Curated annotation (Swiss-Prot):
Subunit annotation: Component of the cytochrome c oxidase (complex IV, CIV), a multisubunit enzyme composed of 14 subunits. The complex is composed of a catalytic core of 3 subunits MT-CO1, MT-CO2 and MT-CO3, encoded in the mitochondrial DNA, and 11 supernumerary subunits COX4I1 (or COX4I2), COX5A, COX5B, COX6A2 (or COX6A1), COX6B1 (or COX6B2), COX6C, COX7A1 (or COX7A2), COX7B, COX7C, COX8B and NDUFA4, which are encoded in the nuclear genome.
Name of the featured protein: Cytochrome c oxidase subunit 5A, mitochondrial
Modified residues (Phosphothreonine): 143
Location within or outside the cell: Mitochondrion inner membrane
UniProt GO cellular component terms: mitochondrial inner membrane; mitochondrion; respiratory chain complex IV
Pathway(s) per entry: Energy metabolism; oxidative phosphorylation
Function noted in UniProt: Component of the cytochrome c oxidase, the last enzyme in the mitochondrial electron transport chain which drives oxidative phosphorylation. The respiratory chain contains 3 multisubunit complexes succinate dehydrogenase (complex II, CII), ubiquinol-cytochrome c oxidoreductase (cytochrome b-c1 complex, complex III, CIII) and cytochrome c oxidase (complex IV, CIV), that cooperate to transfer electrons derived from NADH and succinate to molecular oxygen, creating an electrochemical gradient over the inner membrane that drives transmembrane transport and the ATP synthase.
Motif SIFI-degron, residue range(s) on this chain: 2-22
Gene3D superfamilies: Cytochrome c oxidase, subunit Va/VI
InterPro entries xref list: Cyt_c_oxidase_su5A/6, Cyt_c_oxidase_su5A/6_sf
Source organism of the structure: Bos taurus (Bovine)
Keywords: Acetylation, Heme, Iron, Membrane, Metal-binding, Mitochondrion, Mitochondrion inner membrane, Phosphoprotein, Transit peptide, Ubl conjugation
Membrane topology listed for this record: Peripheral membrane protein
PTM text: In response to mitochondrial stress, the precursor protein is ubiquitinated by the SIFI complex in the cytoplasm before mitochondrial import, leading to its degradation. Within the SIFI complex, UBR4 initiates ubiquitin chain that are further elongated or branched by KCMF1.
Length: 152
């Protein structure tokens, strides 16, 4: 998609340069050509995703019944790359995907990542654990603190 936009821009620029009597080095478009070039500028005016749409997209991703271990890790890696702490409902879906895959290590790692992403905001991680406690109990997942991993 980006490649097509770049090609359109370069084709438009080449058309203006060919139309110029001075060639490529000093294009001087005619008065009517400036408006044509201006309408072909390559800006990104895509729609912005709301928080609810973002959450729904990730919950849907982790709720895929045929998700495999690689997709789980890729999704978590992408999610961790964002400048945010994932909502508990996203983490819940990721933990359930771990359970479907019988991947206890990834489940604990997800909780470690959430704690790390919370950074200096010490109230975020306890809130997330409080919200996830029913899911953790249902799935039999221990927190890193319960496993003693916070002492290492």
């Amino acid at each position: 998609m980006l490649g097509a936009a770049v090609r359109r821009c370069s084709v438009a620029a080449a058309a203006v340069a060919r139309a110029s009597p001075r060639g490529l080095l000093h294009p001087t478009p005619a008065p009517g050509q400036a408006a044509a070039v201006q309408s072909l500028r390559c800006y990104s005016h895509g729609s912005h995703e709301t928080d609810e749409e973002f959450d729904a997209r990730w919950v849907t991703y982790f709720n895929k019944p045929d998700i495999d271990a690689w997709e789980l890790r890729k999704g978590m890696n992408t999610l961790v790359g964002y400048d945010l702490v994932p909502e508990p409902k996203i983490i819940d879906a990721a933990l359930r995907a771990c359970r479907r895959l019988n991947d206890f290590a990834s489940a604990v790692r997800i909780l470690e990542v959430v704690k790390d992403k919370a950074g200096p905001h010490k109230e975020i991680y306890p809130y997330v654990i409080q919200e996830l406690r029913p899911t953790l109990n249902e799935l039999g997942i221990s927190t890193p603190e319960e496993l003693g991993l916070d002492k290492v």
